[in-house]
Amino acid sequence: MSFSTFLNAKKKEVELPDFEGALIADTHAHLDMLEDPARALARSGLAHLGLVVTVASVHENARTICDSLEGWRQSARAMLDAAGFVDIEVPEVRVIVGGHPQDASKMTDEGRALIREVARNKRVVGIGETGLDYFYETSPRAVQKAQFAEELALADELDIVACLHIRDAHDDALEVLRSTGMPRAGAILHCYNMGPETLAPFLELGCMVSFAGPLTFRKAHDVREAAALVPHERLLTETDCPFMAPEPCRGQTNEPAYTAFTAGMLAEATGLSLRECAEVTYSNARKLFGCDK
């Protein structure tokens, strides 16, 4: 099967939404977790992505991620050229670096120093994913809260965005955000998959809201209701790949190209045209991450 073919969950070829030439952005991916990051970037170019933001963990790949990006992009360029797609651009790739809340107990002074060091790389546009995760509770809540506050403060100091991972902990996360303060550059409520009531206080704080595969799930009516309430200038799209592929690809390994399906559903939920949704979310992402500075 050609790398330019997109398949649904039944392994049938599926067409991507038509954004009429507009570009889209995957604001939260884990490229290093994919079998072939270069291939994924080539496919994302075919799916009209102009920007992919990948996450680097201080406990895994923070030292190497920035050095890997150009090699992946060059290989993606070669794949596209070899397949005859010489006019398709490989998306820009930027990085978010931090310590996941599930790993908060692993954080050391050396880890904190490494985050600070890597965050000064020009490709790094945010701190994260940071926050609270009470679903697995692999780290004590108090330790998670302390790390969350530290990373919010670091994002503010460096004037870059904080990417928030919050699971089963929204009330406590609000408490930390209010006590520590929002970073000057803003914060992203990543992979939002709850209803309007949970979202409201985060909107009041000024958070951007990023939607991923769960927005497309058939029974996720509350998530789509929440999306409809987000001011257009706060909307973002993402995959969180390789996890939670959107419909019609649910059950497969997720990849940045599948942002197109989430963007298509976001357009429907918000009443925007496909082109309008692409233009709004892409512009929001580039502005938030300072891609044009």
PLM regions and their residue ranges:
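Mid-domain alpha/beta scaffold segments of enzyme catalytic cores
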Residues: 1-293
